[in-house]
């Protein structure tokens, strides 16, 4: 005798309950909100600061090669480099020294549109300086790289390991043989 099992499925329905929501009637009148307004007869309330700006002339970009951040400025001194490195350390970025022997600037090798290998990838000098707390450590690595490769362009980058992005990059050294034209 074979035993058989019967299964029955019962569908239970419940009546849909209608929820009463009032239709949107627009914004309320502004008369119900207390607002104090300042009279616009005062010159200091104008948003433009045109009268207080002292303009600074930029480094001329004509005939200059485009490098990285700060590329149109004059070369940075050791003190200015140390300040930039201190800035990236304050932001908790990892400093890294990189060098390029042939092209220290953006160039187009594989067509006229930006491509994968068009002057954007440099050789890393040693490993990134994880745990670095002093700009002197980074500048020491730049000096070592200069001694090893005196004809190379050297740059310092700041890498944010939380967001996995490069946040800053600037030229630390241009070879003496380099001409701008």
From Swiss-Prot:
Keyword Transit peptide (UniProt): yes
Subcellular location: Plastid, Chloroplast
Gene: RBCS-2B
Transit peptide: 1-54
GO BP term, pick one: photorespiration
Record-given protein name: Ribulose bisphosphate carboxylase small subunit 2B, chloroplastic
Single GO MF descriptor: ribulose-bisphosphate carboxylase activity
Family: Belongs to the RuBisCO small chain family.
Lineage: Eukaryota, Viridiplantae, Streptophyta, Embryophyta, Tracheophyta
